[in-house]
Amino acid sequence: MQKLFFEKYKTSEVTNTRSVINTPSAFTRKNFFHIQEAGYLKSLKSHLSRRSELNSYLFFVVLSGSGKVTYREPLSEGGMISSTAHAGDCFFLDCSGEYTHISTDEDPWELLWIHFNGPEARAYYTYFRDHHNWHFRSAHFTELINAIESIIRYNEEPTDDTDLL
């Protein structure tokens, strides 16, 4: 992370964080993949985050630190599955299923994340999951980080064509 990027973030007792929320046009929501929210989080101490039944897909990368992600995948009839997360790991979740994540006390994590949706998002997720696990490592980790950072920057000061970027 660039120092300038990090310095913009809000600090609490639990996290340093920055996120952008995007409200795309009705046309964009109907026709394209679109960003709903993207951000950066640095845990200062361990805390649990739990979500379910969101109309969204979440992709996040672990920049540093470690934690645990637990997930009930909607495409599966199984129960909750857990995975330990370390720097360099990637996660891709269908947020209509329940998920939790918590960083460790000993090595709090730093994440970049993006929530997105669109008319073909389910098909994209299903295709991805047919070929990969929801927790994985990518040979293109640096490019993924750069892409998410760019999305955050583009959406911090939206213009008329931000939806299309």
Pin down the residues of each PLM region.
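N-terminal regulatory/effector-sensing and dimerization cores
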Residues: 30-132
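Short, isolated positions within intrinsically disordered regulatory regions of eukaryotic proteins
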Residues: 2-5, 13, 113, 117, ...
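Short, charged, low-hydrophobicity "junction" segments
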Residues: 7-16, 121-124, 146-150
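Weak global preference for isoleucine
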Residues: 6, 20-21, 35, 81, ...
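Amphipathic alpha-helical segments enriched in hydrophobic/aromatic residues interleaved with Lys/Arg
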Residues: 123-165
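Residue-identity detector for threonine
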Residues: 11, 15-17, 21-28, 66, ...
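A short, N-terminal "cap"/entry segment at the start of jelly-roll beta-barrel domains
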Residues: 1-34, 50, 154
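Alpha-helix N-cap/helix-start motif at coil-to-helix transitions, marked by capping-box chemistry
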Residues: 29-32, 115, 138-145
